[in-house]
Amino acid sequence: MIKVFKTNISDRKSADRVIMMLEDGYPEFMITIDTEDCDNVLRVQGHSMFSAEGIMDSILIMGFVVEEMY
């Protein structure tokens, strides 16, 4: 399963911090953030089903804006 999100995570330091936090909760997932894309795209890929809301809640708690892209 792959989910893609639009974020306001625009710098590498913040992206690395968010990725580390998400990897703690989802260690088996592949997680990337493209800070050079205009939408600062977060891509989460896992072998099992997962909730977009869980990912979004974690990012919102860190103070960032996130929106699932369809």
How would you describe each model-predicted region?
Residues K6, D16-I19, E36, H47-Y70:
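C-terminal structural segments of small proteins and small subunits
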Residues M1-S10:
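Short glycine-/aliphatic-rich beta-strand segments at the starts of folded cytosolic domains
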Residues E28-I33:
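A short linear hydrophobic-aromatic micro-motif
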Residues I9-Y26:
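Short amphipathic alpha-helix segments
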Residues M1, L22-G25, L60:
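A general marker of short, structured functional hotspots
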Residues D37-R43:
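Surface-exposed aromatic
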Residues Y26, N40, G63-V65:
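Short, highly charged low-complexity linear segments
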